Amino acid sequence: MRVEIDHRNSGGGKLRHPEKQHRPDNPIQRKPAWIRVKAPNHPVYHETRALMREAKLVTVCEEAACPNIGECWSQRHATMMIMGEICTRACAFCNVTTGQPAPLAADEPARVAEAVARLGLQHVVITSVDRDDLDDGGAAHFAAVIGAIRAAAPSTTIEILTPDFLRKPGALEVVVAARPDVFNHNLETVPRLYPSIRPGARYYQSLRLLDRVKQLDPSIFTKSGLMAGLGEDRGEVGQVMDDLRIADVDFLTIGQYLQPTVKHAAVDRFVTPDEFADLAAMARAKGFLMVSATPLTRSSYHADADFAALREARAARHAA
């Protein structure tokens, strides 16, 4: 069975992506066998889902219609999305709702921390929508969430996946000062495709953000991700890898882009598992500490095991 994507908001019947309704339809291609997944039905999946509902937390697993939700939630792994479920950007690839966000919930850091403690997570991934409406882009809220998790679950390692904080001076410094264990910011695609795929962002702003994290605190692991199958070529991907290595990024993820609705960017092609293996080999040769490149790779997929391997890889490199 395939996981079906909810294209509408629950209740009210409003379109989830009204800003995309003027765009022509892009038919959704049938997925090849190597990226089809079973519908989630494990008892622990339902327990995790119930806990998220009870704590009134949003997850990127649901909002972005992640194909790995069944596997991850069955292991009590969920990526929590803070600062609401409404994003101020309208990226052509993303299934998160676009619109005017609600004010920040002051109790959200405590609710996130409680959920992390109850799930007994060794490693947690926290992401967010873009909040261009806030003076600091939500930086102080990120810091508050990190602090609350440290207090409630001191042994849990924390990975954050942040927006670009475009035109938010001082915001990055606030987040880095909270000392997450991993700072992830996805470049998403190659520079040539930014105008059509990520129009609200700037490639070199994202690259500078990652570079600046390492300048501020070299002990923090940095991570970035790319989508494959949007029309990029191998040479362009190699150049992005080089840019990331110049910025001293430790961990690269590459996964297949999957089109959420007919109003989103079309899949240019489905990249084969062998091609992903080739990209992984190329990335390792360029010096990344860790690489995950498979059709179903997503930013937080297997993040707990990957973090343990990342620490071991750094220790081995320093010992060499």
From Swiss-Prot:
Residues 1-27 are annotated as: Disordered. InterPro entries: Aldolase_TIM, Elp3/MiaA/NifB-like_rSAM, Lipoyl_synth, rSAM. GO terms for molecular function: 4 iron, 4 sulfur cluster binding; lipoate synthase activity; metal ion binding. SMART domains: Elp3. [4Fe-4S] cluster 1 binds at residues 61, 66, 72, 300. PANTHER family: LIPOYL SYNTHASE, LIPOYL SYNTHASE, MITOCHONDRIAL. Belongs to the radical SAM superfamily. Lipoyl synthase family. This is Lipoyl synthase.
